[in-house]
């Protein structure tokens, strides 16, 4: 038997800055980054199944269902909890793949948060975060549920206050592989800034940087072109490992005004920065 569907948001994120500060012996890079949620993203619909099956009803082109992060998240939670229930999954994708907006990670986190409730597991937030880390370094922040300063590989999280803001996000229509970007990252001087320094940098947009941006600009001319165009209006930044780039504004009107000009040439959207994840109160 399949129960009724319930709808859950999976918001995108922006990295307001991203510093590579070291490298672990296993090859993973250590980061300082600030995550901000925005009111744009995907939507998951989930329905409990009594037969224990995990079924994705809306597979993404080019992604086998067994590799989809929502399916992997559901099966991981099912296995680790010993739950006998299953789920039917519908996924409405809006967040571009390979754009640095955390779409897949957010989908996985939403699946874990929602199924934890639908299956009656009552796992605490910290346990879900640890489980999410097995799926990807960006998954825990979406379960953490607050804008955060992240260190380690991105999994050590502390809440950080951010001022209200609107964002114009442009997708250069290229897919960037995170693995390839880090593989080509060759900066040798790696230094930590720390929370106090980061809070000072966040006061304006001029001093913010993404250490991965130069790697992507060299390999993807389309990203370089969009950044050059956006510099006419402010201090743009790439999010994550790319390819999406963004500008921060104090008001929606300002963001909309610039987007009306750029939308004739580029695909993108305007979104408001959030204080917390829409499902923050769904995890404890």
UniProtKB/Swiss-Prot annotation:
<dbReference type="GO" id="GO:0019288">
    <property type="term" value="P:isopentenyl diphosphate biosynthetic process, methylerythritol 4-phosphate pathway"/>
</dbReference>
<comment type="function">
    <text>Catalyzes the phosphorylation of the position 2 hydroxy group of 4-diphosphocytidyl-2C-methyl-D-erythritol.</text>
</comment>
<comment type="similarity">
    <text>Belongs to the GHMP kinase family. IspE subfamily.</text>
</comment>
<dbReference type="InterPro" id="IPR006204">
    <property type="entry name" value="GHMP_kinase_N_dom"/>
</dbReference>
<dbReference type="GO" id="GO:0005524">
    <property type="term" value="F:ATP binding"/>
</dbReference>
<feature type="active site">
    <location>
        <position position="13"/>
    </location>
</feature>
<dbReference type="InterPro" id="IPR020568">
    <property type="entry name" value="Ribosomal_Su5_D2-typ_SF"/>
</dbReference>
<dbReference type="InterPro" id="IPR013750">
    <property type="entry name" value="GHMP_kinase_C_dom"/>
</dbReference>
<dbReference type="Pfam" id="PF08544">
    <property type="entry name" value="GHMP_kinases_C"/>
</dbReference>
<dbReference type="InterPro" id="IPR036554">
    <property type="entry name" value="GHMP_kinase_C_sf"/>
</dbReference>
<dbReference type="InterPro" id="IPR004424">
    <property type="entry name" value="IspE"/>
</dbReference>
<feature type="active site">
    <location>
        <position position="138"/>
    </location>
</feature>
<dbReference type="GO" id="GO:0050515">
    <property type="term" value="F:4-(cytidine 5'-diphospho)-2-C-methyl-D-erythritol kinase activity"/>
</dbReference>
<comment type="pathway">
    <text>Isoprenoid biosynthesis; isopentenyl diphosphate biosynthesis via DXP pathway; isopentenyl diphosphate from 1-deoxy-D-xylulose 5-phosphate: step 3/6.</text>
</comment>
<keyword id="KW-0547">Nucleotide-binding</keyword>
<dbReference type="InterPro" id="IPR014721">
    <property type="entry name" value="Ribsml_uS5_D2-typ_fold_subgr"/>
</dbReference>
<dbReference type="GO" id="GO:0016114">
    <property type="term" value="P:terpenoid biosynthetic process"/>
</dbReference>
<protein>
    <recommendedName>
        <fullName>4-diphosphocytidyl-2-C-methyl-D-erythritol kinase</fullName>
        <ecNumber>2.7.1.148</ecNumber>
    </recommendedName>
</protein>
<keyword id="KW-0067">ATP-binding</keyword>
<keyword id="KW-0418">Kinase</keyword>
<feature type="binding site">
    <location>
        <begin position="96"/>
        <end position="106"/>
    </location>
    <ligand>
        <name>ATP</name>
    </ligand>
</feature>
<keyword id="KW-0414">Isoprene biosynthesis</keyword>
<dbReference type="Pfam" id="PF00288">
    <property type="entry name" value="GHMP_kinases_N"/>
</dbReference>
<keyword id="KW-0808">Transferase</keyword>
